[in-house]
Amino acid sequence: MKKSFLFTFTVLTIFTILVIGVAPEKLTTCSRFLSQKSGKCVKEDCDRMCKQKWPGKYTVGHCYGQFKDAKRCLCSVCGPDRQPP
């Protein structure tokens, strides 16, 4: 009886540890407008400024607005439970 309880407890413990370790990371998406001087948004500059303000491999900058008249820089940060400050 004691051995079967110990065996069951060990199997359940190992199973629980494996399930917790394999659980996928929760992803969140955060987008913030970056204050920018007046003028046209340039994608390369927008991307660079976003990565300076919110460093990380998930940070991307996009120009937001009418196609060629985009005037705002939108920073998107997508990562495991990460929010821009």
Curated annotation (Swiss-Prot):
Intracellular or extracellular location(s): Secreted
Cysteines paired by S-S bonds: 30-78, 41-63, 46-73, 50-75
Presence of keyword Disulfide bond: yes
Keyword Signal (UniProt): yes
Highest taxon of the lineage: Eukaryota
Record GO cellular component, one term: extracellular region
InterPro entries the UniProt entry points to: DEFL
GO terms for biological process, alphabetical: defense response to fungus; killing of cells of another organism
UniProt keyword list: Antimicrobial, Disulfide bond, Fungicide, Plant defense, Secreted, Signal
Signal peptide feature range: 1-24
Protein family: Belongs to the DEFL family.
Identification of the protein by name: Putative defensin-like protein 142
Biological classification of the source: Eukaryota, Viridiplantae, Streptophyta, Embryophyta, Tracheophyta
